[in-house]
């Protein structure tokens, strides 16, 4: 071993010790607290990123947090619709979900994507349980109300008992965003919305949305204009003033709604960064945008 090798090892080990030391107060602060993670975007498609997200989720559980995962699966839904000769259609950013499409959405989200995530968490040493809204009436649906979009729903009610029971016993609930209304009709619900409503119902410490952007940017073309922290009032103003636009609007609105119902902090982070979850939760600087409820800004 050369002197350069020895120096590199010393520096690497020193960095690891510093990172662990920096994480300790956050681990102590958040022990026993619930963190709802919306898992989607590139972090679901890239196998290397997927492995790191799964390991992060298991790490959260191992150090005493109570992670709950809500996942999307749009690209895989589109892939299966294509295989079955059904053309994906969208209206105002929402997937038009007729009866045939709803069958595919449920098959893919509940039967494939959910079970893959569960298996990966279990392989990484966690204890995951797969659920959708229909299981134990975890959450029920109502029509979204927009004409011409079919079985696209909103969350009507959340029953937290099953989540509390699982999380308090060391299990990691993995939730797909399919639910039924009071007649038993299945609905496709936006996964961000489901994550926000579950976080609100549980009074979660954090709602974290893994996205394909750095967070909220003052200039969406310039990654260096990341806004690291805002409160709920400032977040609303960013929408009104046109700083937050396009697909970021429903994500920020989802965060604002959950904060207004008692979630302490919401985070929009870049899931393309390896170990994004741990970097956001357990480091002083973080990597994305944190939105705080007005009662917690001090």
Curated annotation (Swiss-Prot):
<feature type="site" description="Transition state stabilizer">
    <location>
        <position position="38"/>
    </location>
</feature>
<keyword id="KW-0055">Arginine biosynthesis</keyword>
<feature type="binding site">
    <location>
        <begin position="73"/>
        <end position="74"/>
    </location>
    <ligand>
        <name>substrate</name>
    </ligand>
</feature>
<dbReference type="GO" id="GO:0005737">
    <property type="term" value="C:cytoplasm"/>
</dbReference>
<keyword id="KW-0028">Amino-acid biosynthesis</keyword>
<keyword id="KW-0418">Kinase</keyword>
<keyword id="KW-0808">Transferase</keyword>
<dbReference type="InterPro" id="IPR037528">
    <property type="entry name" value="ArgB"/>
</dbReference>
<keyword id="KW-0067">ATP-binding</keyword>
<keyword id="KW-0963">Cytoplasm</keyword>
<dbReference type="GO" id="GO:0006526">
    <property type="term" value="P:L-arginine biosynthetic process"/>
</dbReference>
<comment type="pathway">
    <text>Amino-acid biosynthesis; L-arginine biosynthesis; N(2)-acetyl-L-ornithine from L-glutamate: step 2/4.</text>
</comment>
<dbReference type="GO" id="GO:0003991">
    <property type="term" value="F:acetylglutamate kinase activity"/>
</dbReference>
<dbReference type="GO" id="GO:0005524">
    <property type="term" value="F:ATP binding"/>
</dbReference>
<keyword id="KW-0547">Nucleotide-binding</keyword>
<comment type="function">
    <text>Catalyzes the ATP-dependent phosphorylation of N-acetyl-L-glutamate.</text>
</comment>
<dbReference type="InterPro" id="IPR001057">
    <property type="entry name" value="Glu/AcGlu_kinase"/>
</dbReference>
<feature type="binding site">
    <location>
        <position position="188"/>
    </location>
    <ligand>
        <name>substrate</name>
    </ligand>
</feature>
<feature type="site" description="Transition state stabilizer">
    <location>
        <position position="251"/>
    </location>
</feature>
<protein>
    <recommendedName>
        <fullName>Acetylglutamate kinase</fullName>
        <ecNumber>2.7.2.8</ecNumber>
    </recommendedName>
</protein>
<dbReference type="Pfam" id="PF00696">
    <property type="entry name" value="AA_kinase"/>
</dbReference>
<dbReference type="InterPro" id="IPR036393">
    <property type="entry name" value="AceGlu_kinase-like_sf"/>
</dbReference>
<comment type="similarity">
    <text>Belongs to the acetylglutamate kinase family. ArgB subfamily.</text>
</comment>
<feature type="binding site">
    <location>
        <position position="95"/>
    </location>
    <ligand>
        <name>substrate</name>
    </ligand>
</feature>
<dbReference type="InterPro" id="IPR001048">
    <property type="entry name" value="Asp/Glu/Uridylate_kinase"/>
</dbReference>
<dbReference type="InterPro" id="IPR041727">
    <property type="entry name" value="NAGK-C"/>
</dbReference>
<dbReference type="InterPro" id="IPR004662">
    <property type="entry name" value="AcgluKinase_fam"/>
</dbReference>
<dbReference type="GO" id="GO:0042450">
    <property type="term" value="P:arginine biosynthetic process via ornithine"/>
</dbReference>
């Amino acid at each position: 071993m050369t002197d350069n090798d020895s120096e590199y090892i010393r520096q690497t080990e020193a960095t690891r010790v510093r990172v662990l030391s920096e994480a300790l107060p956050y681990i102590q602060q958040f022990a026993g607290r619930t963190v709802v993670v919306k898992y989607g975007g590139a972090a679901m498609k890239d196998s290397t990123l997927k492995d790191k997200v799964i390991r992060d989720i298991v790490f959260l559980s191992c150090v005493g947090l109570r992670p709950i995962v809500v996942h999307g699966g749009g690209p895989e839904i589109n892939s299966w619709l294509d295989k079955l000769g059904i053309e994906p259609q969208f209206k105002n950013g929402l997937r038009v979900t007729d009866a045939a499409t709803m069958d595919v959405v449920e098959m893919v989200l509940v039967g494939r994507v959910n079970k893959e995530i569960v298996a990966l968490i279990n392989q990484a040493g966690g204890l995951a349980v797969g659920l959708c809204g229909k299981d134990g009436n975890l959450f029920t649906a109502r029509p979204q109300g927009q004409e011409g979009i079919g079985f696209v729903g909103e969350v009507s009610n959340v029953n937290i008992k099953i989540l509390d029971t699982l999380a308090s016993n060391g299990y990691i609930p993995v939730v797909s965003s399919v639910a039924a209304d009071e007649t038993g009709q299945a609905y496709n619900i936006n996964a961000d919305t489901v994550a926000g409503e579950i976080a609100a119902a549980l009074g979660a410490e954090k709602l974290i949305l893994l996205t394909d952007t750095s967070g909220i940017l003052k200039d969406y073309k310039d990654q260096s204009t990341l806004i690291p922290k805002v409160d709920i009032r400032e977040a609303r103003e960013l929408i009104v003033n046109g700083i937050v636009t396009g697909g970021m609007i429903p994500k920020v609105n989802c965060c604002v709604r959950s904060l207004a119902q008692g979630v302490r902090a919401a985070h929009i982070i870049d899931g393309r960064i390896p170990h994004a979850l741990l970097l956001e939760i357990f480091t002083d600087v973080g990597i994305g945008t944190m939105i705080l409820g007005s009662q917690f800004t001090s």
